[in-house]
Amino acid sequence: IRLDSLSNQTAMANVSRIEDPMARALVWTAACDAARDAETSSSDFIELVFAHLETETESTTIQTILRQLVTNGNLYIPIGTRPQALERIADGLIDLVTKAKAGSDSQLQFVKFLPIFARSASQQQWMQDLLSGKIQLAGFTVDQDVRWELTTGLVMNGVFGESEIAAELARDNTANGQRFAAGARAAI
């Protein structure tokens, strides 16, 4: 859908106040489409997400928005400002993780998407601390899949290497663990 200028401004400023989940999803879709089609800037879309995603209640909508952030951050942000945009997204996800309802699906989704964006030393340290248990999130268990996702994210950024992959594989020497280890090794 396309919104006229006034409707777009009103909807984007108030997306988190829209009560009907379907209407909210349509507004989010319009925002994603506008960023994709360069009708609004990708950085504006990122700011919209972090101004309103915290209150989104629909798990599928959250996942769709996070996937759009991946596309937006990796394809639509100009290369010259991409590192800053990816750091902004990671910082926003860390903030959302800490504010999310304990044990919620949104909390899990924010953690799972974080390794895709985390670039700075502080973001890498946050992931290491979550992986090691130094950071404890209420209601959140760092299960084996999350361990692999964090490990792979740390490998992608050169923080972890073969020894950490081997240690994780020793912990999870299953078919799934073998698949995750292959993915982590491919990220070296």
Cite the ranges covered by each PLM segment.
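Long, ordered, helix-rich scaffold segments
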Residues: 1-188
